[in-house]
């Protein structure tokens, strides 16, 4: 029964994809991104469509290395090109990134990576409805302005003017690892008028329109986190659990681990699921 629901969802997901599509899928080896990759592999099977993975390595805890190696193994098994983005802050001077800084860093890395693609990619992110609801409460409880554009399924973001450290691994063609460009902090690599300097490493980027918008799609927003949990249990996906999700030091984890369970006890077992419907 559950498998029928999964494949019916995969069929619905096909409506988001055009006949020819260059997909950049964010991948952390967690249950959300793993299920998204599972769906995309079943959908993108013909030669006209391309799929690439991107993994952001935070270096903030020892368990991150497990996700790092799991991403490499999955990419090598399915012969999918993998891009690894490394965190650039100096951990000796700054022990923790704020949640907003970490989120902005991830989105910027997705957009910068789009500059490396020959064709304009569609960025697929494994955000569920639970993530969007947490984002809403995160803004609401901090008394900040709530941008409802963040709650929509599709987003359009401007590509930033700087380019960061990337390691690109193409398993289909070769196993070589190429370091792309240099650190964004080195201002010598970028002119004041935002035109990239002329050299062989950056010639391809001079052809890019840095004012273009990149489409960010979140196809799992109709699903609750518990739904994804049941799917990955049934499919036996080899996910890596992020222990930082249990750390209530972070604001979002307090919303997820404390606020939502209390709401289910006091009001309704499906309170958070019902609230998600407001943003769809």
From Swiss-Prot:
Belongs to the tRNA(Ile)-lysidine synthase family. The N-terminal region contains the highly conserved SGGXDS motif, predicted to be a P-loop motif involved in ATP binding. It holds the Pfam family ATP_bind_3. This is tRNA(Ile)-lysidine synthase, plastid. GO terms for biological process: tRNA modification. Keywords: ATP-binding, Ligase, Nucleotide-binding, Plastid, tRNA processing. GO terms for cellular component: plastid. Ligates lysine onto the cytidine present at position 34 of the AUA codon-specific tRNA(Ile) that contains the anticodon CAU, in an ATP-dependent manner. Cytidine is converted to lysidine, thus changing the amino acid specificity of the tRNA from methionine to isoleucine. It is an enzyme of class 6 (ligase). GO terms for molecular function: ATP binding; tRNA(Ile)-lysidine synthase activity. The keyword tRNA processing applies. ATP binds at residues 28-33. The keyword Plastid applies. The gene is tilS.
């Amino acid at each position: 029964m559950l498998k029928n629901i999964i494949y019916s969802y995969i069929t619905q997901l096909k409506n988001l994809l055009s006949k020819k599509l260059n997909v950049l899928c964010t991948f952390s080896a967690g249950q959300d991104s793993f299920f998204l990759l599972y769906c995309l592999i079943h959908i993108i099977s013909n030669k006209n469509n391309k799929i690439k993975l991107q993994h952001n390595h935070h270096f903030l805890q020892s368990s991150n290395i497990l996700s790092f190696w799991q991403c490499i193994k999955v990419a090598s098994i399915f012969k999918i090109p993998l891009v690894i983005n490394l965190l650039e802050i100096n951990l000796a001077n700054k022990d923790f990134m704020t949640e907003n800084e970490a989120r902005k860093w991830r989105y910027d890395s997705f957009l910068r990576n789009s500059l490396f693609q020959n064709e304009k990619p569609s960025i697929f992110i494994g955000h569920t409805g639970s993530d969007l609801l947490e984002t809403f409460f995160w803004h609401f409880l901090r008394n900040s302005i709530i941008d409802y554009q963040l709650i929509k399924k599709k987003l359009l973001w401007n590509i930033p003017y700087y380019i960061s450290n990337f390691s690109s691994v193409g398993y289909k063609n070769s196993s070589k690892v190429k370091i792309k460009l240099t650190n964004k902090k080195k201002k010598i690599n970028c002119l004041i008028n935002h035109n990239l300097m002329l050299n062989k490493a950056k010639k391809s980027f001079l052809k890019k329109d840095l004012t273009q918008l990149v489409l960010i799609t979140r196809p799992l927003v109709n699903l609750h986190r518990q739904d994804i949990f049941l799917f990955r249990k049934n499919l036996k996906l080899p996910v890596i659990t992020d222990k930082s999700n249990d750390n209530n030091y972070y604001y979002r984890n307090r919303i997820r681990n404390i606020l939502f369970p209390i709401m289910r006890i006091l009001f309704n077992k499906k309170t958070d699921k019902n609230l998600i419907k407001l943003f769809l």
